[in-house]
Regions:
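N-terminal secretory/membrane-targeting segments
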Residues: 1-146, 163, 168-171, 178-181, ...
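Solvent-exposed soluble domains appended to multi-pass membrane proteins
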Residues: 120-489
Length: 489
């Protein structure tokens, strides 16, 4: 960004120098032709070169070198500055502005107390852990699952499961889970990007506009609402698997600070012969995880973050069986027909297929395994026409396993933050104490995230929410989150 701006200014100056000539230049016969050609070449080439540098050695962000992959220091701004000084400085400025204006606004004891009351917590306790202590009310699964698996699918969106797109067959695993397990499609991700959504799982807190993965847990204590902490209290060893690089967003250190015993990623996988700049193929990731699961002897919780359904969409999905011609013939007017779009659809199909294969095979190995499947976000697919908010921003949520009632989530609406308490309700005997900021899904009829809400079966933007009570609850949850970020517990 800074490079492009500098080149524009430089080119503008050159243009002025060419057009506004001194009188003595005329007397001397004007600038020589080759000088003008050099100036013209600079005017044309420098902006192109600046754009090439701006996107990490390409003319589009999907094809360039991601700054995460070029990380060489412990500091995000310095890593990004290797490829783009302007973008790095802009990110630092915006983060600082958010921190000063919203997240780090002073919160009084009285304001925090009112927020706790609004969310149904106990204001008389001396900690938020105790304030939001809950007792499981649901009947636990007849058999405690030895393995619990949460799959957070990269861009695993709701839209391929909507009636107008279902005939494309891009989410056959989702359709199967819909029939075999419990599900809700009235569901929201915690954010509009992978890290903001992942922060919700790893802290149990709603998004407040900060990258808390760099700040929380540094004092040695995990968030009591974190999914890793919740599962550890339920007696599980906690393991995080990521299909990308460990340097991305300081993910390894953050997961280990927030309740996970182990962290594994793509650099532990055998050579695949193909990869993208974003990570290893989901199929290879699932294969390695299944092998590890077969060797486990203790109760273990696996959190899996996939990567294949992400730019640059470079896998040979046709070789993996993607029915390109059939899908193209069925495309509705709202989906473009260019090759890049069809390639992206192929990656949606591939990620869904290998996830389904993994679930079925693990289920054969251990029938007691409990699965949760959802997407980290939607909002990454470019439709050709305007579509509904459900198609643009919705993600599905499935619970599948031995003894899970198919009507478990009937009528429910919720978000990522409510998966951890739902697991506690399913696994722990009635009356067991657990900690959660929000209600479990089976007790929830509405939801919110950073900008959207679901109420009475409808989705909308928060700025249009007229329910004052619901608005108050949303702000109360964010107040608790801001306070925890400030205190870092």
């Amino acid at each position: 960004m800074a490079a492009a701006f500098g080149c524009v200014c430089f080119d503008g100056g050159l243009c002025v120098a060419v057009v506004v000539r001194r009188p003595e230049d005329e007397c001397l016969g004007g600038p020589k032709r080759h000088v003008r050609l050099w100036v013209l070449g600079a005017v044309v080439c420098l902006p192109i070169f600046a754009i090439f540098c701006r996107f990490g050695g390409a003319f589009h962000s999907d094809d360039g070198v991601p700054w995460e992959s070029a990380a060489r220091t412990r500091y995000v701004v310095l890593n990004e500055a290797v490829l783009d000084d302007g973008q790095a400085l802009y990110r630092a400025y915006i983060t600082h502005k958010r921190a000063k204006s919203r997240a780090n606004r002073p919160i009084s004891d009285e304001e925090l107390k009112q927020a706790v009351v609004c969310l149904g917590g106990d204001p008389k306790t001396d900690s938020l852990d105790a304030a939001f202590s809950r007792q499981s009310q649901a009947e636990a699964l007849a058999k405690r699952p030895r393995h619990v698996v949460v799959i957070l699918g990269e861009n695993y969106a709701l839209w391929p499961l909507l009636p107008e797109y279902r005939s494309l067959g891009l989410a056959q695993t989702g359709e199967w889970l819909e029939k075999e397990g419990a599900y809700t499609y009235h569901f929201l991700s915690n954010g509009n990007g992978t890290m903001t959504s992942l922060n919700g799982f790893l802290t149990g807190l709603p998004d407040v506009g900060l990258y808390v993965n760099y700040t929380m847990g540094l004092k040695g204590k995990a968030s009591p609402f974190a999914i890793g902490e919740t599962m550890k209290r339920l007696g599980y060893r906690t393991v995080f698997w990521y299909g990308g690089l460990r340097s991305w967003q300081d993910l390894e250190h953050f997961t280990l600070r927030e309740g996970f015993d182990e962290f594994h990623c793509a650099d532990e996988l055998p050579e695949q012969g193909e990869s993208s700049s974003w990570g290893a193929p989901d199929g290879a990731l699932f294969d390695v995880i299944q092998e590890r699961m077969q060797k486990e002897s203790e109760d273990t919780f696996y959190f899996i973050l996939t990567t294949s359904n992400h730019p640059p969409f470079a896998y040979d999905v046709d070789a993996k069986g993607f029915p390109r011609v059939e899908v193209t013939e069925k495309l509705p007017p709202s989906i473009p027909r260019d090759k890049a779009t069809i390639d992206q659809l192929g990656h949606i199909w591939y990620a869904d297929q290998v996830m389904g294969k993994f679930i079925r095979e693990v289920k054969k190995d251990d029938p007691s395994t409990l699965f949760v499947v959802t997407g980290d976000h939607a909002e990454r697919f470019n439709f050709a026409t305007d579509v509904s908010l459900w198609a643009q921003s919705g993600v599905p949520c499935y619970f599948y396993g031995e003894g899970v009632p198919k009507d478990l989530l009937q009528g429910a609406a919720g978000s990522h933050l409510q998966i951890a308490p739902t697991l506690a309700e399913l696994i722990a005997p009635q009356g067991t104490t657990y900690t959660s900021l929000l209600l479990p899904l089976m007790q929830s009829k509405r939801a919110f995230n950073h900008r959207l809400f679901i109420e009475n079966g409808e989705i909308g933007e928060e700025k249009a929410l007229s329910n004052a009570e619901f608005n108050k609850e949303i702000e109360a949850a964010r107040t608790v989150a801001r306070w925890m970020v400030q205190q870092d517990r």
